[in-house]
Regions:
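C-terminal catalytic lobe of FAD-dependent flavoproteins
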Residues: 266-268, 274-280, 286-372
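Dinucleotide-binding Rossmann-like beta1-alpha1 core, especially the glycine-rich loop
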Residues: 43-122
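A conserved short coil-to-beta-strand element within the FAD-binding core of flavoproteins
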Residues: 162-176
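Flavin-dependent oxidoreductases
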Residues: 179, 183-274, 289, 293-294
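N-terminal Rossmann-like FAD-binding beta1-loop-alpha1 element of flavoenzymes
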Residues: 2-27
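Helix-loop-beta segment of a Rossmann-like dinucleotide-binding subdomain
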Residues: 76-88, 113, 120-158, 284-288, ...
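Glycine-rich FAD pyrophosphate-binding loop
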Residues: 21-40
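Residue-level detector of alpha-helix initiation sites
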Residues: 9-10, 33, 353
Length: 372
């Protein structure tokens, strides 16, 4: 069968991956020359430990398995099974970590509580003060600015994949797409993975779509000059992800309120090392549109302060700063908004911040539901 996929970010590319793997022919359209949205502006952090119990955790675990398989087939993805650490310093933070490793599903999440020496064995670059750390062994990273393009180049070698950049799809019906150059692309089925683009065609097809947009700010440093052995999060991550929530996080919030800057910007601090040695650090979360177009310095100052406290040393110079926008379902329980808009056309959007982690499993499930 011939499958049309719209959107060249991680979500669209993973749908194309599974379609080609199942023997189908794929035409892949992207309105930009190449992906420029959230997939290439994020951490490349494949997170399992923080996911909500049930469907989301299962999707993240399967997504991580698939990323490892894809990384083995496509080295340019840069898959690294490095795990992640959340260093803790206070009694309230330690209580959260202990509660999490005592969960009934802690093994599924790969959780372990490490003492300070064990944590620094995993990541010797952590020279700041810490008492212990929550380790999530199943977490991994990929290279976000390279991964989707590397997968697309690999798919092109199959002889059953065609990428068409600079083509905005303006009409979709019955498996046929019309782009803004007036060309029609006929397929047996079409999957629209348009990311944070929720107007135009998407609004026409699904005007009541329960999805919002979220804006973030991030930065990347020059090379650190040493191996940063794991991904790292500060303890604001306990406040942010539903998979960590419980009486223990309520106690943390009561005993140790979040820093005012972090609270006002919806922040946690995540740090992931890139293949060139630089550190990707973020992020903020803004939910009310219209979004500012400025990059504000207050959250960057907070990120720098937290990162330097974890490292116990100054950060390397900042190489670049940027903002990104992703689509998130208003109801956090479904992993993604998946809607059949006609007999041959499906719309898949709104995975939120779990898009990079879960895209491979989301694509797999979509094709299963389509009977492909």
């Amino acid at each position: 069968m011939r499958i049309a996929v719209v959107g060249a970010g991680a979500l669209g590319t993973m749908h194309a991956w599974h379609a080609v793997a199942r023997g189908h022919e794929v035409v892949h359209l992207e309105r930009e020359p190449q992906a420029r949205g959230a997939s290439v502006r994020n951490f490349g952090f494949v997170q399992v430990g923080c996911r909500a119990e049930g469907e989301e955790l299962a999707a993240a675990r399967r997504g991580r398995e698939l990323w490892e398989e894809i990384g083995a087939a496509v080295p340019g993805v840069g898959f690294r099974p490095c795990g992640s650490l959340v260093p803790v310093r206070t009694d309230a933070e330690l209580a959260v970590a202990k509660a999490l490793v005592g969960r009934h599903d802690a093994a599924d999440r790969g959780f372990a509580l490490l003492d300070a020496d064990e944590a620094r064995t995993r990541n010797p670059a952590l020279r700041g003060a810490l008492r212990a750390a929550l380790f999530a062994e199943r977490d991994a990273v990929v290279e976000p600015r390279r991964a989707v393009r590397a997968v697309q180049e690999h798919l092109a070698g199959s002889g059953r994949y065609t990428f068409l950049g600079g083509r905005e799809v303006v009409e979709a019906a019955g498996g046929t797409l019309r782009d803004d150059r007036g060309e029609r692309h006929h397929a047996d089925a079409a999957v629209l993975c348009t990311g944070a683009w929720l107007g135009g065609l998407v609004r026409d097809l699904a005007p009541d779509l329960p999805v919002r947009r979220v804006r973030l700010q991030m930065m990347q440093t020059e090379p650190l000059g040493e191996d940063f052995g794991t991904a790292v999060a500060d303890t604001d991550t306990f406040r942010f992800y539903p998979g960590y929530a419980g009486p223990w996080t309520d106690a943390l919030n009561a005993e140790q309120p979040q820093h005012p800057t972090a609270a006002s910007w919806g922040m946690q601090t995540l740090i992931v090392q890139r293949a060139d040695g630089g550190l990707t650090i973020g992020d903020t979360h803004a939910y009310d549109e219209p979004f500012d177009f400025d990059l504000d310095e207050a959250p960057y100052a907070h990120l720098t302060e937290v990162a330097e406290a974890l490292l116990g040393r100054p950060l390397p110079p900042v190489r670049r700063r940027w903002a990104g926008v992703y689509a998130q379902g208003l109801d956090p329980r479904p992993v993604v908004q998946r809607r059949r808009v006609d007999d041959r056309t499906w719309l898949v959007t709104g995975p939120g911040g779990r898009g990079m982690s879960c895209s491979p499993s989301i694509g797999e499930t979509t094709l299963d539901e389509m009977g492909l």
